[in-house]
């Protein structure tokens, strides 16, 4: 059941390693793997097909489904962005014109550039995995596309997305926007976010709901827990990766929250329900939550090493 999520990770890694690290032999190896993946996708009508001959559930970039099937409305923009990036990266890595032709076909005949004008459907900051995918992919697409008209369209979609996401104070998202557009990208907030980031990457129990916080109750309308309108500083909240929710106040206190909820007469007491129930010092997060945005910004000249 390989999904589009996994393909995003592969192509982001292949492209950056190819451009920044690989020697000639490694470039040949990367090109061989990328060609196998893209040929499979194109040979199967823009799908990943498993060994049983059935397409996997989520690895779908079929333009007819994305453009015409309402069940794919939330993936339409995101998956359009993905496949255009895969193809452009594939052409850059392999030189195979088949991928450039497929890119132009999706732009010309299937209006995928139009799909990217507002590729993010705003969701009240509830679906963070796709946000991360989008910023990873747009950073590559803007690297490999030279056409000024296409770049302006893609930048329009990125700006629409970032205008919504900048409330999260996500340093990586801010840096991608700045690197790809040359516009002001809230550098000061991003630097503060990284400077405040805990050295201890263990997921400890956190309880912040007792505080006088600004609660956003809208998620409860779709059966989700309340969250904050504004994320807490990095050292006060759960350790976050780029694809996790920075608006959650608590972590690892399910039992305590349930006890308070059942004993309280306050109808809003359920705001104490935590985002997770298993953070008890048993998980260690990857250091890339810090190093990835930091070195991305250093590479693009957005920040400098402190003296």
Predicted regions and their residues:
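Extended HEAT/HEAT-like alpha-solenoid repeat tracts in very large eukaryotic scaffold/adaptor proteins
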Residues: 2-9, 13, 79-83
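Soluble non-cytosolic domains of exported or imported proteins
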Residues: 4-8, 24, 28, 74-77, ...
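Residue-level signal for well-ordered alpha-helical scaffold segments within enzymatic catalytic domains
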Residues: 9-20, 89, 140, 305
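A surface/extracellular/periplasmic glyco- and lipid-processing/surface-interacting theme
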Residues: 11-51
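Ser/Thr/Asn(+Pro)-rich, low-complexity disordered segments
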Residues: 37-84, 89-307
